[in-house]
């Protein structure tokens, strides 16, 4: 991810796709109930690492960008990325999370079974272990959380990007947009909470790239 930032910001390519799975958006800096910063099957938050590197002063080994926007679309809210970049307001970052939500998004029948890591989360009292339905509110202007219905669809994500994300991104005027794509939103994922096809991921990425052309000369890292 850091190498991708170098390539995009350095002008070697207009945008870049990093073959990383997962982006790590549940890994944060705050300890959760299991006394670790890793959670939700994520150990290293590559997206947050790339954003921090991009904005680090040149004298400290970074690239010195003023503003980076992270757009996260996934079944779950990216609690770790928000925790690292935006636990308090930081004018360098805008974090956008588009995720499943609503009262009908209640998880699996065994969601409170602490021994079943596949079931934990969603609307569970143990959601600190797997974040599930958190992220319905935005704590400050550096965060835009957009909970959708119970199933993530291309139509809903696309509409959110055009109607809610685009004005916010244009106002923020980032130097770089980083996409955090959650592939568990694929319609064939065994959890069954996503409705996206491979083509949908491509279309959503194209819409995000168009936002980048309008705001930061097309510089996108996914």
List each language-model region with its residue ranges.
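Fold-level signal for large, globular catalytic cores of enzyme and receptor domains
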Residues: 2-13
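Short, well-ordered coil/turn segments that N-cap beta-strands
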Residues: 13-14, 218
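Conserved alpha-helical scaffold segments that buttress catalytic/binding sites
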Residues: 6, 17-214
